């Protein structure tokens, strides 16, 4: 195997597949990338047995065909370190991969291609096309609310719902919930899958860099997202996602509208003196005024008043300050709306005049 390729043609794809490769070296070949050079171009593949990401690079100059596997991290780091206009030569010499450019040469150890696992792709009955940017935004607006290592394994991921007219993405860790939606025509009939946490994070990262149309297909076991450049395959989490609609609070609404940046900066200052373990913050609501208060066991405290548009009842409510901060960080509008249902019930956080994004945050006793 021997070929040459410019850094700009391979660097981005290499970084993306390297982030999928298994970092714990329990099975050494999973830390490697499969490189396959042939007439159609260069194929890069990485897997951790849950995710498989494949990239096809056509802009190479092929000298001889072949394939091998080499350390994902080391190869990505090396390519990242060379100047942008560098032309790299890859040559497989027995059990080592030689990479050279100008006066530089590196020799990498390889592992047998036969040891590299390739995903068994199931049958996919239907697929839907949508801009990668839209799916990336849905994941970005919800994934912060995913659980991590929860015994309720179905919470360690995001719910993807596809109906004939829209796609919904939902995430919850039991203390907060994020729901985002986009309108699109599909051939699906109210189908649901749960995408694992790492898969959701890697997919968002991928689609942020490839915002054009992608195709999505899935069955009960696998998700496939693909374009002309890449194919992303992920196993799914088995089981049923909880009926999240029951989490949305009911009752008399009391709406507060505010400048998002004003609330964020006040929260950031309050966070400095909040309890490091429980992360509590108190909202004191009065006519057109929101007082944000925090304290800690060292008898330190902070409070700040933020002008808001509010005509509801005066009351106090506590939250985990990190939950509010993370919610606001993915809201795109300059104006934000909090919808309260009393001091004992969850609160909604929304973009003003936008029903495609809803965050639910449970209250906290302070």
Provide a role label for each language-model segment.
Residues 1-366:
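Structural preference for solvent-exposed beta-strand-turn elements
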């Amino acid at each position: 195997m021997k070929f040459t390729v410019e850094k700009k043609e391979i660097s981005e794809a290499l970084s993306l597949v390297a982030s999928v490769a298994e970092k714990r070296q329990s099975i050494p070949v999973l830390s490697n990338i499969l490189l396959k050079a042939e007439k159609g171009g260069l194929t890069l593949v990485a897997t951790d047995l849950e995710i498989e990401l494949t990239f096809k690079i056509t802009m190479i100059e092929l000298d001889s065909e072949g394939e091998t596997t080499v350390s994902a991290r080391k190869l990505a780091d090396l390519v990242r370190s060379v100047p942008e206009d560098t032309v790299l030569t890859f040559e497989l010499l027995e059990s080592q991969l030689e990479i050279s450019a100008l006066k530089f040469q590196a020799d990498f150890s390889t592992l047998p291609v036969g040891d590299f696992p390739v995903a068994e792709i199931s049958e996919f009955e239907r697929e839907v096309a949508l801009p990668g940017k839209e799916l990336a935004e849905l994941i970005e607006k919800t994934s912060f609310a995913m659980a991590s290592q929860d015994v309720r394994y179905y919470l360690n991921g995001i719910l993807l719902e596809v109906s004939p007219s829209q796609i919904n993405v939902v995430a919850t860790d039991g203390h907060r919930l994020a729901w985002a939606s986009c309108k699109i025509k599909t051939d699906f009939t109210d189908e649901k899958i749960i995408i694992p946490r790492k898969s959701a994070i890697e997919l968002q990262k991928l689609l942020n860099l490839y915002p054009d149309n992608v195709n999505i297909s899935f069955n009960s076991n696998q998700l496939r997202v693909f374009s002309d450049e890449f194919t992303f395959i992920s196993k799914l989490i088995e089981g049923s996602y909880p009926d999240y609609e029951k989490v949305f609070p009911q009752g008399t609404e009391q709406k507060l509208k505010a400048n998002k940046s004003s609330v964020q900066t006040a929260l950031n200052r309050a966070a400095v003196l909040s309890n490091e373990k429980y992360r509590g913050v108190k909202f004191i609501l009065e006519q057109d005024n929101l007082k944000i208060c925090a304290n800690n066991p060292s008898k330190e405290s902070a409070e700040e008043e933020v002008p808001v548009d509010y005509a509801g009842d005066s009351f106090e409510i506590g939250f985990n300050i990190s939950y509010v901060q993370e919610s606001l960080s993915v809201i795109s509008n300059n104006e934000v709306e909090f919808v309260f249902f009393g001091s004992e019930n969850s609160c909604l956080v929304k973009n003003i005049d936008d029903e495609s994004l809803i965050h639910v945050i449970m209250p906290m006793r302070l």
